[in-house]
Amino acid sequence: QKDFVWMNSIYRKMTYVFYFLCIAVTCTVFASPILYKIWIGDKVDIPFVLTCSIALYTIIHCWDSLQVMLINGVGSVKLQTYVVLIGLVLHIPLSLFLGHFVGILGVILSMCIINLIYSTFFTIQIRKILSQKATGIWIK
């Protein structure tokens, strides 16, 4: 059934959970030096910028997942299939390119870029669906 009032309500609630997650990830980033010390001691030095980049990826990926869950629930997965296939083709060359110049941060940056592309398309798609303005590829 197409209960858009209920779906909008769920989307809003899930968005609040996402905001809480952003706060939790941010707190974890600031606590990371202490947590790393407890977890692995002085065996490995993890750069703070690496922690921040992983946190950024986590936040982007969680936002992306929120959109995808609802899109999958509605069954409008054609656009998702195309966008993810393009992302898969672009991810490895982009990771290799950025990894060559920036190292491990380049690979994480590549993941962030690809997931930002996903998130952009999927956020537009779910908002079109929930506002009942989706047509063409946006609703298939």
Question: Where would I find each of the regions flagged by the language model?
Answer:
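Serine/threonine-rich low-complexity intrinsically disordered regions
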Residues: 1, 45-47, 102, 125, ...
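Specific pore-lining/lateral-gate transmembrane helices of multi-pass inner-membrane transport
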Residues: 1-42, 46, 55, 63, ...
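Interhelical loop/hinge segments that connect adjacent transmembrane helices in multipass membrane
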Residues: 2-5, 128-140
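Short runs within selected transmembrane alpha-helices of multi-pass transporters and secretion channels
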Residues: 25-26, 30, 49-75, 79-99, ...
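Membrane-interfacial segments
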Residues: 35, 39-43, 102, 106, ...
